[in-house]
Amino acid sequence: MRRRPLCTSASRVTASLLLSFLAVSSAAELPILPAPPISPQPHSSEKDFSLRHIFHHGTYKYPELHRRLDVPENAAVWAAEHLHSEHREPVPRLRVKAEPMSIQRLADRSKEAIDGILEWGRMKGRAVQLAEDDWTIDEIAGPNVTDRETVLSFARMASNAYILEPNTGEWEDVGGGFNYTEDFGWESDGLRGHIFADTENSTVVIGLKGTSPAMFDGSETTTKDKENDNLFFSCCCGQGGQFLWRQVCDCQTSAYTCNSTCLVTALREKNRYYYAAQDLYHNVTALYPHAEIWMAGHSLGGAVSSFLSLTFGHPAVTFEAVPEAMPASRLGLPVPPGHEIGSLQKRKMTGGYHFGHTADPIYMGQCNQATSVCTFGGYALQSVCHTGKKCVYDTVKDLGWRVGIGTHKIVEVIKDVIEKYDAPPICEPYINCTDCYTWKYFESNGTETTTTSTSKPTSTSKSSKSNTRTRTETCKTPGWWGCLDETTTGTQTSTSTPKHTSTSSTSTCKTPGWFGCKGRQRRANHNNNKVLAHNYPRPSTHRNNNILFLPNINFFMSVPRLVRRLSRRRRPSLPNKTEVVNSSANHFVYVLHA
């Protein structure tokens, strides 16, 4: 190849040198550009999980109990509807797809920092105001809730019970050295956590399951469950609603009006399930300090999983969870600046996904009607708002289901809902939601007392057999069938010996209901009017002045079946001078005139 001859012209050489100097000087003045960002390592799109540990933390009967059972790698694990179920199935493959997600959480999530924030909120009844610098938005690997198999795996991890083969592992006490080996029934009290880890121990799922609450009082634990749930999930401690709701405080001042100062004082009692879950969480993070934590849970366990998710900033996938936005606010969980305190349902980037179907009254916030099983059990579940995003299967429209508590169990949800649909529902935030919208809350100085005054007219002779009750003050709680204020009979007097005397009294109804005041009432003697109970069981304590209501409901009978049975039933033959004063699907009330 022929080489190009060198340039010998002085002018050309000078021009070339000048251009070279200019290029070098210009490059020196230019700013040094940063290196292009290194693309983040792609999150593993598929993870296989297996059961590694089972934690059990006591709540009421054994509050200091905390045990751990390690599951061997090749142990045979079976799934069942409950611990004593005869029907068992081998646990299928737990495969989960992951995807990048953004989550807003506290920058300092240490135990000491979180405990200080929660203690302040517990004493004040509201979340502490934190600066914007205290929060961070992190991109982490989260579950892909658009994948059907991922949703199924989370539902199985939130299942009721996992049973190991006999003689597989032993329970060990986690700290404290408390020995409950000889105590019977410790497994039925408390919160149980099933710990799943992937093959690389990079992601851990905590599946929480609370002990199934009994519907009717039979033990101290059941009563404590009702007190705990009615404090956090009802509008005002179970007051101002159904007759059978268990009342756990006296903060209602009038109809749909609640003293928030009184309510905060009642809420200072720690939520046993939430604090037990925190202790369980810290033990899991100690075992897996570098792993990303995901949460799963069903029903009450789903609500507690959501509490942990909002507190420590982890993704959560729950199933048929009790609406938890209102109790999360009452726990004083922290919220980022710019968010209205008490409206956690409007908070974004929480990482929470709540799956459920429209036929479940607990998930939909409808298990508070007069004929609901929750009401019969004394539970006042009035909260309706979820945090994060709701993922709703419309089983009422798509499958023709009727609303009922029987569709709440996780086994039915897996087999009859998730596996029946070809794809999971779309998860959307439900921000146009308000808890207890008919209620008014006010703050006070905490020194108010409720008093009841009675008038005592002078008397010159004995009262007669028939008494007429009149009120001397304005009715504070009007109802459908008259005033619902509780009446306390004053001293019966008369100025002579007439046939009828009048009794004046004043009252304050603490707990209004549909058919009268729920408080204890003193009945006057009514000899002229007698209530006839015609071949019916002994009535309950539900009395309303001169009328005795006779419940005739099978608690476990469906409403349509009840209506059909009542429509076929003939009313009993009655004596003369008998008046039917009220008849409904729930009661037959007759009054026999003397």
Swiss-Prot record:
| Protein name as it appears in the record | Putative lipase ATG15-1
Q: Which Pfam families match?
A: Lipase_3 (PF01764)
Output the PANTHER family linked to this UniProt entry.
Answer: LIPASE ATG15-RELATED
Q: Does the keyword Amino-acid biosynthesis apply?
A: no
Entry function = Lipase which is essential for lysis of subvacuolar cytoplasm to vacuole targeted bodies and intravacuolar autophagic bodies. Involved in the lysis of intravacuolar multivesicular body (MVB) vesicles. The intravacuolar membrane disintegration by ATG15 is critical to life span extension.
SUPFAM superfamilies the record matches: alpha/beta-Hydrolases
The catalytic residues are S299 (charge relay system)
What are the UniProt keywords, alphabetically?
A: Autophagy, Endosome, Glycoprotein, Hydrolase, Lipid degradation, Lipid metabolism, Membrane, Signal-anchor, Transmembrane, Transmembrane helix
**GO molecular function terms attached to this record:** phospholipase activity; triacylglycerol lipase activity
GO CC terms, sorted: membrane; multivesicular body membrane; vacuolar lumen
Q: What is its EC number?
A: 3.1.1.3
Give residue ranges on the Lumenal side. Answer: 34-594
An example GO BP is: multivesicular body membrane disassembly
Residues in the Cytoplasmic compartment per record? 1-12
Stated membrane topology is: Single-pass type II membrane protein
- Bilayer-crossing residues are 13-33
Which parts of the sequence are annotated with region: Disordered? 447-473, 489-509
Regions of biased composition (Low complexity) lie at 447-469
- Report the catalytic activity: a triacylglycerol + H2O = a diacylglycerol + a fatty acid + H(+)
What organism is listed for this UniProt entry? Phaeosphaeria nodorum (strain SN15 / ATCC MYA-4574 / FGSC 10173)
Q: State the oligomer form and interacting partners.
A: Binds to both phosphatidylinositol (PI) and phosphatidylinositol 3,5-bisphosphate (PIP2).
Keyword GTP-binding among record annotations: no
